[in-house]
Amino acid sequence: MIKDLAKNKKALHDFSILETFEAGIVLKGSEVKALRAGRANLKDSFVRVIKGELFLLNAHISYLETTHSAFRPNERAARKLLMHRKQIDKIFGQVSQDGLALVVLALYLSDKNIVKARLALAKGKNLHDKRETLKRREADKEARAAIKRYV
C-alpha cells in the first residue's frame, strides 16, 4: 500500500504529464519524521539536473517542534534524488532537447516504508489549455451527476 505524504496539485494544473518516474530521495531522519507528520509543501518545487545528478529544489519540509535546534535542517535545502544513470541520461536528453520540464508530483512511502518521489516529464500548459481542461472536467462532472440522478 502506497501512502502519499505530500502532493503537488499545482503541477497537475499547470502541466500536461507525458511520462512518470520513481526516484529515491536523500533525507535526514528528522525530515522523514516531518514528512510522516504531513509537514511538506511541494507547491513551487522543481527538479534540475546538476552535474549529472538530479536535485529536488524549492521543496519545503518543515521541521518538527521536537527537533533539537542543532539538528534543524534548512527547510528549502536542495535534496538529491536517486535514479539509475541511464534513466537520468534519458531524462536529461528529453528535458534539454524537447523543452520539457521535470516536476515532482508527490512524495510517498513505498511498501518497504522508504520515502520515494514521483517525478514527471511534463509540458507546460497555456492559459487556454488550462481553461479547456477545467471546462472538460466540469462537463464530465455534470454528466456523471445527471446519470446518477436519472438512474
From Swiss-Prot:
SUPFAM superfamilies per UniProt: Small protein B (SmpB)
Transmembrane segments: none
One annotated GO molecular function: RNA binding
Cellular location(s): Cytoplasm
Keyword annotations from UniProtKB, A to Z: Cytoplasm, RNA-binding
GO BP annotation list: trans-translation
GO cellular component terms, semicolon-separated: cytosol
Top-rank taxon, per record: Bacteria
InterPro entries, per database record: SmpB, SsrA-bd_prot, SsrA-bd_prot_CS
Primary subcellular site in the record, as a coarse category: cytoplasm
This protein's record includes keyword Cytoplasm: yes
Record has Transcription as a keyword: no
HAMAP family hit by this protein: SmpB
PANTHER family xrefs: SSRA-BINDING PROTEIN, TMRNA-BINDING COMPONENT OF TRANS-TRANSLATION TAGGING COMPLEX
Family, per entry: Belongs to the SmpB family.
Free-text function comment from the UniProt entry: Required for rescue of stalled ribosomes mediated by trans-translation. Binds to transfer-messenger RNA (tmRNA), required for stable association of tmRNA with ribosomes. tmRNA and SmpB together mimic tRNA shape, replacing the anticodon stem-loop with SmpB. tmRNA is encoded by the ssrA gene; the 2 termini fold to resemble tRNA(Ala) and it encodes a 'tag peptide', a short internal open reading frame. During trans-translation Ala-aminoacylated tmRNA acts like a tRNA, entering the A-site of stalled ribosomes, displacing the stalled mRNA.
Protein's name according to its UniProt entry: SsrA-binding protein
Organism: Campylobacter concisus (strain 13826)
Lineage: Bacteria, Pseudomonadati, Campylobacterota, Epsilonproteobacteria, Campylobacterales
Gene: smpB
